[in-house]
A protein has these predicted regions:
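Conserved alpha/beta enzyme-core scaffold
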Residues: 1-352
């Protein structure tokens, strides 16, 4: 991307992407008119450009994004990928992020790749044939490592409460952050847990190695930890490298409610920015300001509700701004988006219960 923005001969280029970490020069004011960022899920680096109207945001379920590409509702001219090196059979893989990248790579003729020696080789539906790559560059650089939010007393208490709701034989879905980490850190006395999730991070590694996560009782992808992407430390990336027990699938499969519901005792742990007294959950915006995106929360909340013995959980601290602002409110802020409807909410957990 850094090289792309230096091209002075390019005009009106639309860049469709999920969360981007690091440099986002393509969204700087001086490139307006040449490049247009279109976030399908966003983060800290692009909130300001979106708020100022220099970048676009599309509210969409993560599970619906692959169809945008495969049906050419969004016709892609080229895709930029970071891949693992090819094996003896000429198979590269999408590494840590299969999610929407698989559909994108299958839906365009031009694949531009960075083949990174440090990208782990992953299994599942991760293969990109080397022969399909139009142009590539080789690199040997560390992957981005996500910093873990520190666990405070509030997160610890929420983690204890949710861990108490997780039964032996449960199938887990969780995100990244202090609360999911706090939950996972308190599951070491459980047995035969399974993982079927949109993403996971470092704490799952410990549960697998200790034999807490076996995936033995899952009905879908039995014996396999299933995800669409991972983010965390080098330790996590080393764990998934050439690991046949971890399968990466496109997010229209991992987040398919019909598959999620087939697993037993699905515990879906999802967060919120605020929730009103009727149960409406805002998880993607602060008033009119876009904060992140819709993601897969609704898919897993609904899938867990349909699972036999499932527990769809919205977890959040009761307050923000060092206790000065309640996150449990009579009504959502003006402009706030509803990600999960009041009809889909079953369990809400704060530090008070």
């Amino acid at each position: 991307l850094d090289a792309l923005v230096q091209r002075t001969d390019l005009e009106a280029v639309k860049l469709y992407h999920l969360h981007v970490a690091g440099n986002v020069a393509f969204a700087e004011p001086e490139y307006e008119g040449r490049f247009r960022s279109v976030s399908l899920f966003t983060g800290a680096h692009l909130r300001k450009p979106i708020a100022e109207g220099r970048a676009d945001f599309v509210p969409i379920f993560l599970s619906d994004i692959p169809k945008l590409f495969t049906t050419r509702q969004v016709p892609l001219d080229a895709v930029l990928l970071q891949l693992s090196p090819p094996d003896a059979n000429g198979h590269c893989t999408l590494g840590t992020s299969v999610d929407t990248a698989k559909a994108a790579s299958d839906s365009t003729r031009i694949i531009l790749a960075e083949i990174n020696e440090q990208m782990p080789r992953t299994h599942g539906r991760s293969i990109v044939e080397f022969g399909r790559i139009t142009a590539f560059m080789r690199s040997d650089r560390p992957l981005h490592e996500a910093e873990h939010a520190p666990e405070g007393k509030v997160e610890a208490r929420i983690g204890e409460i949710i861990a108490g709701l997780v039964e032996d034989g449960s199938t887990l879905q969780m995100g990244i952050g202090a609360i999911p980490d706090a939950v996972l850190a308190r599951l070491h006395d459980k047995h035969d847990l399974g993982i079927h999730t949109e993403m996971f991070s470092d704490n799952v590694v410990d549960l697998v190695r200790e034999g807490v996560v076996t995936n033995r009782l899952k009905k879908v992808h039995t014996g396999r930890t299933v995800t669409s992407f991972v983010t965390g430390s080098k330790r996590l990336y080393d764990f998934v490298d050439d690991n046949l027990t971890v399968e990466f699938h496109p997010c229209d499969r991992t987040n398919d409610t019909a598959l999620i519901r087939d697993n037993p005792k699905v515990v879906a742990i999802n967060s919120a920015i605020e929730i009103d007294l009727s149960g409406q959950v805002c998880a993607d915006s602060m008033g009119h300001s876009i904060y992140s995106g819709i993601g897969g929360q609704m898919d897993f909340i609904h899938g867990a509700a349909l699972s036999v013995g499932g527990k769809p959980i919205i977890a959040l601290p009761s307050t923000a701004a060092k206790g000065k602002v309640s996150r449990i409110v009579p009504s959502l802020k003006n402009g706030a988006g509803v990600v999960t409807t009041r009809g889909h909410v079953h369990w809400v957990v704060t530090e008070y219960g």
